[in-house]
């Protein structure tokens, strides 16, 4: 696989989602290199620690959900410097992956055993719309907390604001702490809302609205979407080796 092959794969995989969101903002490259790519590493975030792990595994190409954040001062500059020094290319894909049929929200829902997805995460007029899934049979809130904790490999925070069992689940992976999103879940009659970040306001509003709330980490609520993308890449280019560059549970 080379960079042209990869570009063609991304275009065919994401289609018009690439037109909906801005290149070099919501998806793009750091240090793109013309070379045959054999070893591909993947994870959620681009950080100096991730690049160091990639170097240790002789990775040539890193795929992440997030680019290095500009507001983490000097981090992106350091990442680009290390990518260049170690001759590693990097590709990130953010909102198109969030909204893809196989993307972050749907992949998390599938990971916790959801029976059917009834609403796809998407954007309308620049506003995010939550994903919704349903179980065929309701489960206890405590069982869902255990499922999410096991899937993410970390303790999660949970607020039981209703005694209802869980059948209908609303989710936005990553930074889904907006009260607007929680209100969507409430108005859709979801029994629980799952996300990857919280604030005082999200916790207070969920309690006021009487909707159960489960919060994992931003990083690990979103890794399943990246993994789904890389599995598709491996199916298209069987000669590549894929390596999970697992990050620290620090949130």
Kindly give the residue locations of the regions a language model identified.
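Active-site catalytic microenvironments in core metabolic enzymes, especially phosphate/sugar-handling
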Residues: 1-251
């Amino acid at each position: 696989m080379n960079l042209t092959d990869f570009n063609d794969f991304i275009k065919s995989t994401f289609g018009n989602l690439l037109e909906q969101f801005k290149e070099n903002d919501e998806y793009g490259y750091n240090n793109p290199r013309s070379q045959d790519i054999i070893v591909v590493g993947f994870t959620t975030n681009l950080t100096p620690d991730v690049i160091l792990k990639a170097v240790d595994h002789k990775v040539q190409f890193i795929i992440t959900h997030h680019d290095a954040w500009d507001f983490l001062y000097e981090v992106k500059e350091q990442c680009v410097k290390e990518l260049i020094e170690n001759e590693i290319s990097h590709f990130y894909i953010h909102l198109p992956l969030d909204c893809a049929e196989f993307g972050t929200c749907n992949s998390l829902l599938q990971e916790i055993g959801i029976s059917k997805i009834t609403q796809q995460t998407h954007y309308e007029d620049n506003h995010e719309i939550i994903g919704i899934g349903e179980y065929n049979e309701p489960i206890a809130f405590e069982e869902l907390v255990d499922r999410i904790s096991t899937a993410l490999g970390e303790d999660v925070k949970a607020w039981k604001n209703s005694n209802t069992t869980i059948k209908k689940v609303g989710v936005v992976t990553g930074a889904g702490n907006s009260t607007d999103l929680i209100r969507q879940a409430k108005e859709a009659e979801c029994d629980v809302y799952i996300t990857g970040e919280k604030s005082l306001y999200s916790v207070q509003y969920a309690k006021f609205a009487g909707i159960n709330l489960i919060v994992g980490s931003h990083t690990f609520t979103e890794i399943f979407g990246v993994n789904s993308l890389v599995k598709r890449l491996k199916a298209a280019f069987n000669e590549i080796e894929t390596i999970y560059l697992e990050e620290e549970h620090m949130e």
